[in-house]
Curated annotation (Swiss-Prot):
Sequence similarity: Belongs to the Fmt family.
The name this protein goes by in its record: Methionyl-tRNA formyltransferase
GO MF annotations, alphabetized: methionyl-tRNA formyltransferase activity
Keywords, in A-Z order: Protein biosynthesis, Transferase
Catalysed reactions, as listed in the record: L-methionyl-tRNA(fMet) + (6R)-10-formyltetrahydrofolate = N-formyl-L-methionyl-tRNA(fMet) + (6S)-5,6,7,8-tetrahydrofolate + H(+)
InterPro entries given in the database record: Fmt, Formyl_trans_C, Formyl_trans_C_sf, Formyl_transf_N, Formyl_transf_N_sf, Formyl_transferase-like_C_sf, GART_AS, Met-tRNA-FMT_C
GO cellular component assignments: cytosol
Amino acid sequence: MRIVFAGTPEFAAEHLKALLDTPHQLVAVYTQPDRPAGRGQKLMPSAVKSLALEHGLPVIQPPSLRSADAQAELAALRPDLMVVVAYGLILPQAVLDIPRLGCINSHASLLPRWRGAAPIQRAVEAGDAQSGVTVMQMEAGLDTGPMLLKVATPIAADDSGGSLHDRLAALGPKAVVEAIAGLAAGTLRGEVQDDALATYAHKLNKDEARLDWSRPAVELERQVRAFTPWPVCHSSLAGASLKVLGASLGHGSGTPGSILEASRDGLLVACGEGALRLTRLQLPGGKPLAFADLYNSRREQFAAGQVLGQ
């Protein structure tokens, strides 16, 4: 089959790698325009673009697919199928209609739960027992199309957004390759999603990563895991920023945000319900460290009675 691939981040690049190992012809790779990154704000290619160029694949980077010219360029490729993974651009119906077999998408959740931009982190944050990958036939709605294939994986008690991402990035490509084989053979039939079961995974932002100590400790512990490695939960102590990259549930009570105890086991902080033990922190200008290492050199900085987030 003649396949056009569309994707941008590393999660998508893993899918492109899998397609490179199939007999199908990759006629073009679509990815978002290069973006400024790093301290120098130098324009950097996406993970998908870098991989595509390594393998000599044509790369197309339109700012939008809404224009007639962009759609004509895609149609000229005569694709049988378009595979879309975390592309980041809206595909209008006119684009979805161009490939002979339409467009399929690998989405990092068990649809219809967690439609939207941040399904991996929202699943961890919500305390879901499992996550997975759904390969669906795309339609104009956001992640609403018929489901072709689903693969599930348990969410462990210590899973972070990063660890679950990596696991799904390994499961997704295999599911897409299997779905393409089924479509080519005409043996795959889509299952309509039940909209009544749908939830929406809103895009992450740095503002919501600020820890609200009035919330229950069990919720904050999940939030810390979900938001690692990005956007990283944070608070403040004595006016200085404090990034929280590891935490566990503790015992104790007090004014929300107050330090109950500091030891090599962690910094115990009172929450609206229960207490959270901070086990891995990053101070301004420093690198992430186990709290035991910070305690050895800065124990006076974490004296009990101080309040975080003020």
